[in-house]
From Swiss-Prot:
Native source organism of the sequence: Synechocystis sp. (strain ATCC 27184 / PCC 6803 / Kazusa)
Family as reported in the entry's similarity comment: Belongs to the TrhO family.
Group of enzyme by EC: oxidoreductase
Stated role: Catalyzes oxygen-dependent 5-hydroxyuridine (ho5U) modification at position 34 in tRNAs.
Transmembrane parts of this sequence: none
Lineage of source species: Bacteria, Bacillati, Cyanobacteriota, Cyanophyceae, Synechococcales
Gene behind this protein: trhO
Catalyzed reactions per annotation: uridine(34) in tRNA + AH2 + O2 = 5-hydroxyuridine(34) in tRNA + A + H2O
Name of the protein: tRNA uridine(34) hydroxylase
PROSITE patterns: RHODANESE_3
GO molecular function, one term: oxidoreductase activity, acting on paired donors, with incorporation or reduction of molecular oxygen
Keywords noted in UniProt: Oxidoreductase, tRNA processing
Length: 278
């Protein structure tokens, strides 16, 4: 049996957070769903997994609680549910940039479809930036994209000030896993006075789901924050596992007959047993 994995986010001003937390936690548990839902005054960010009908009911009720008829979602599949339990958490931000003046509900950059994205990547006048963390970029990114070498998203404003402040009149295009980080980053750049800011609608996941492999400018795999670790074209489960010691993503390789292989983590140097049961 395959389980559905659904991700979505929405920037909107929310109140009664504790009430929504309690209601959604109870609902997710009752429907047998697992995953993580982050709630903040700026909106909601969710990844949930389970049976399709249960997810459909959960999302429908959540959308109604948010005053929406529907929310844009990304769907993929996994052989097992890639979460241990359902967690609904209240946070200061649904994605932590540390810039309280930034309001994606007020302004964001220009959305670019996966079909249009390849044109931007091949435009020499466009600065293409991967807004994800360094360990995510290490296993896959777009051709020609700049890696800011950040350890966490909160470091992105410092990268902008140190590297992009003199390029405010240039076209800047950004991307991330599912769209939420580059959407907030685009709002930040506009707030800082950048003239033309673009971001990939639906993020890498939408691109991998939409663009045929022979047309794709993606290289490698896309890190995801669940037990699948990474996905590839068509959102199929990738070939990475996490280091038991430091959490760095390791490539498993083609181990057709061997269930476990000993590897040395290139990040921390410790020996780790990597499971090939993806």
């Amino acid at each position: 049996m395959a389980y559905q994995v659904t991700t979505f986010y929405h920037f909107t001003r929310l109140n009664c957070l504790a009430e929504k937390q309690s209601r959604w936690q109870e609902l997710g548990d009752r429907l047998g769903l697992k995953g993580t839902i982050l709630l903040a005054e700026e909106g909601v960010n969710a990844t949930i997994a389970g049976e399709s009908a249960a997810i459909e009911e959960m999302v429908k009720i959540m959308a109604a609680d948010l005053g929406l008829t529907s929310v844009p979602q990304r769907h993929s599949w996994a052989k097992t549910i890639p979460f241990q339990r359902m967690k609904v958490k209240i946070k200061p931000e649904i994605v932590s940039l540390g810039q309280p003046q930034v309001n994606p509900e007020k302004q964001v950059g220009t959305y670019v479809s996966p079909q249009q994205w390849n044109q931007l990547l091949q435009d020499p006048d466009v600065v293409v930036i991967d807004t994800r963390n360094d360990y995510e970029v290490a296993i896959g990114t777009f051709q020609g994209a700049v890696n800011p070498c950040t350890k966490k998203f909160r470091q992105f404003p410092d990268y902008v000030k140190n590297n992009l402040d003199q390029q405010k009149n240039k076209k800047v295009a950004m991307f991330c896993t599912g769209g939420i980080r580059c959407e907030k980053a685009s709002a930040y750049l506009l707030e800082e006075g950048f003239a033309e800011v673009y971001h990939l609608r639906g993020g890498i996941l939408h691109y991998l789901e939409t663009i045929a492999p022979e047309e794709s400018l993606w290289q490698g795999e896309c890190f995801v924050f669940d037990e699948r670790v990474a996905v590839q074209e068509g959102l199929k489960v990738g070939s990475h596992a996490l280091c038991d010691h430091c959490g760095y993503p390791l490539r498993v390789g083609d181990l057709a007959e061997i269930r476990y292989a000993v590897r040395h983590c290139p990040q921390c140097g410790l020996t780790v047993a990597v499971s090939n049961e993806l």
